[in-house]
Structure formats: structure tokens, C-alpha cells
């Protein structure tokens, strides 16, 4: 068992934390806004650890679902299931165990949060299969990656206001932006194996579509900032996030594989900048 631990860690991408961070930033945004900048330490621990656990479970299910495709993609041909080092049932069992651990974490929380966790589990588990029939599966991914937003509001306020769903919508557009950059890396392989991605759906308009999605995301956060009366520190964070989006354009405009991958990874800074602006605004109100 312990000898196989490195394989399991590779399966759930513990060596690639970017995915967990892309889930965590919008969840932290929601925790801070829902609590007026004062989330409790237990909630921070629950949502942070839960985010990592569910992202790990999602990776295991994704590799199980894509096991017959990954062998034909340069970037994924050596993943543990595809290479035969881990059996398919092991990935499913690991995903189930991680999901159970995540559910145990939220047992102290209210009933609404638990109910939303069931919906979150369904969306996360079904996402990998949408690549077979949905033209823009990245939009579905945005719902899966953003479900921590309504759950955070539910845990703190015991209801989910419209603001939470607006923030989730922003996350959908952001996810389409960064995961289209990711899909541009595998475009040629995805054409051969016949799966659907936003990079293929957008075609020659892929760069324009990505920048439009960034614009919508940032535009929604303009509305949030105005609605909540955020101050200068928030707008500095917003401006830094907008700068990141502009920088991504310089990386993806020529559609070079590694530059597109670099743009995808750099979204950690975009998400971090938005959160820093939100956290800084609330911190300034304490004094």
C-alpha cells in the first residue's frame, strides 16, 4: 500500500497544486464576502481542506473516465491508469474515499450546506463525461469548480443570496477562459480522438472568446465591487487581475502550446489578485 502511495499522489495531482488553487480562490472570495471579511478559522480549515479533497477526487474520476483517451494524448499518455500502474477500480475507490472524507468535514455545518454538497458531488463526478457530448464542457467545469461559492454562503448565512449565484456565473466565465487555454495545448490530439473542448468549438475565434470570457468575469467583479461599496484596495486587486488577463493575451495570441499552458498556470495570480483585493478591503475596515 505505502509503496503505491506515490502513484496515488500522482493520480490526484498532488504534484500539481494549480487545480486546487483555481478552486480555492473563488471559494475564499465567497467566505470573505459572506462573512463581511471575518470567516471563522474552523470554516477556513473545512473549506480549504475540502477543496483539496474534492479536487483530488475529481482528478481520480477524470482519469478513470478518460483512460481510453489519455493514451493518445502526449501530455497524458503516462498517467498512472493509462500506463497500467493503477487499475481503474482503484481510481474509483480512491475518489469515493476522498469524497467521503470531504463530506465528513462538513458534518458540523448546517443542512443547506450538506444538501448543496450532494449537488456539488454530482457535478464534479459527471464533468469528465461531458467532454463526449457537450460543445463547451469547460462551462460545466466552471460550475463544478465554483460550487464552493454557494456552499460558503450557505454555511455562513444559512441561505444562498443572488450574489452567490452571480459570483458562480463569474467563475463559469473564468473557467472557460483558463481551461480553453489548457485545451489549446491538446488541440491536435483532441481532434484525433474525437472529444469536445471549447478550443475546438471556438476554432479560429478561440483567443477572442478567451478574452471575452475574461472581460465578462472582470466586469461582473466590477459590479460586485460597486454593489458592496468596495474601496481603493479592492480596485487595486481588480486592476492587477485585469493586468494578468492582458498578459495572458500576449501568451496565447500565437497559439503556441507551451505559451498557452503558461497562461493557464498564470491564472493562479489572477485569482489571487482578486482575492487579495477583497481581503485587503475588509482588513482596512477593521481599523
Curated annotation (Swiss-Prot):
Pathway: Cofactor biosynthesis; ubiquinone biosynthesis. It is found in: Cell inner membrane. Its EC number is 2.5.1.39. Its main location: membrane. The chain crosses the membrane at residues 41-61, 92-112, 133-153, 160-180, 218-238, 267-287. The keyword Cell membrane applies. It is a multi-pass membrane protein. Its cofactor is Mg(2+). InterPro entries: HB_polyprenyltransferase-like, Prenyltransferase, UbiA_prenyltransferase, UbiA_prenylTrfase_CS, UbiA_sf. Pfam families: UbiA. GO terms for molecular function: 4-hydroxybenzoate polyprenyltransferase activity. It catalyses: all-trans-octaprenyl diphosphate + 4-hydroxybenzoate = 4-hydroxy-3-(all-trans-octaprenyl)benzoate + diphosphate. PROSITE patterns: UBIA. It comes from the Bacteria. Coiled coil: none annotated. Keywords: Cell inner membrane, Cell membrane, Magnesium, Membrane, Transferase, Transmembrane, Transmembrane helix, Ubiquinone biosynthesis. GO terms for cellular component: plasma membrane. It is an enzyme of class 2 (transferase). GO terms for biological process: ubiquinone biosynthetic process. Catalyzes the prenylation of para-hydroxybenzoate (PHB) with an all-trans polyprenyl group. Mediates the second step in the final reaction sequence of ubiquinone-8 (UQ-8) biosynthesis, which is the condensation of the polyisoprenoid side chain with PHB, generating the first membrane-bound Q intermediate 3-octaprenyl-4-hydroxybenzoate. Belongs to the UbiA prenyltransferase family. This is 4-hydroxybenzoate octaprenyltransferase. It comes from Paraburkholderia xenovorans (strain LB400).
